[in-house]
């Protein structure tokens, strides 16, 4: 079995972990080896340890700025211009999470030596399918399939908290502000790192995918991760378990 993984961010490295644990040889390509997605601005955490030696933490979720008679996800959608099926639909009071950066560092230490430099373009698909039995892609979907309809919205982020708005004390919390008259919409303090995400005027740009209906046209090409599948609900840890599931059928 010859397998290639495109992208060495969190999703790609978790796919590599699943393959390595099952003694499947693989090649791992990335256009920027040893950078991955760990340096991206904004809120990041893992929902599952995927067998890594990580300590679970509880992150509490809060919503402020609600209008009477309106559901939070509706107000949030209008404020950001996102679809109604957004993060505030059935938002739990808390999540049990794991440190994203620690996980990435462990994975990079284990599998980083396998990463080879290669910038993928759509014309490479034919040669990849000739050389490999399976292609696992975690890179942005339109890079591999430009015909896919891949929309996104852009917001901004700044480090720190939204002064002078009062924030609950303590670590490991996420506060959503859905008041449409306030620029910031999410504040997070998770694992000691603070971010405030705003509609405009930030120091960093964050892209948020708008789900597509595109599916892989070839059963040998497996699309993993939020960006690889262009599905906001495809979280990083899903890449690990989806790879294991696929392996059971190969």
Set out the residue ranges of the language-model regions.
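Central helical "cap/lid" subdomain
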Residues: 36-37, 122-182
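Helical element adjacent to the flavin cofactor pocket in flavoenzyme catalytic cores
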Residues: 84-134, 138-142
């Amino acid at each position: 079995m010859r397998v290639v993984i495109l992208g060495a961010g969190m999703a790609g490295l978790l796919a590599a972990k699943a393959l390595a644990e099952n003694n499947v040889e693989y090649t791992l390509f990335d256009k920027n080896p040893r950078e991955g997605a760990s340096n991206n601005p904004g809120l990041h955490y893992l929902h599952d340890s995927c067998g890594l030696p990580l300590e679970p933490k509880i992150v509490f979720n809060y919503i402020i700025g609600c209008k009477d008679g309106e559901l939070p996800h509706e107000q949030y959608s209008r404020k950001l211009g996102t679809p109604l099926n957004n993060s505030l639909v059935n938002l739990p009071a808390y999540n049990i999470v794991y440190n994203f950066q620690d996980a990435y560092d462990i994975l990079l230490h284990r599998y980083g030596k396998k990463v080879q430099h290669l910038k993928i373009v759509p014309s490479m698909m034919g040669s990849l399918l000739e050389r490999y039995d399976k292609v696992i892609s975690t890179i942005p979907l339109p890079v591999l399939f430009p015909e896919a309809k891949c929309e996104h919205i852009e917001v901004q982020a700044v480090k720190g908290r939204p002064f002078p708005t009062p924030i609950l004390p303590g670590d490991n919390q996420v506060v959503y502000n859905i008041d449409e008259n306030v620029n910031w919409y999410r504040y997070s303090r998770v694992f000691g790192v603070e971010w405030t995400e705003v509609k405009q005027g930030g120091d960093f740009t964050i892209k948020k995918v708008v789900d597509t209906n595109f599916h892989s046209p070839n059963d040998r090409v497996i699309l993993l991760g939020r960006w690889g599948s262009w599905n906001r609900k495809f979280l990083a840890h899903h890449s690990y378990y989806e790879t294991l599931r696929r392996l059971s059928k190969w």
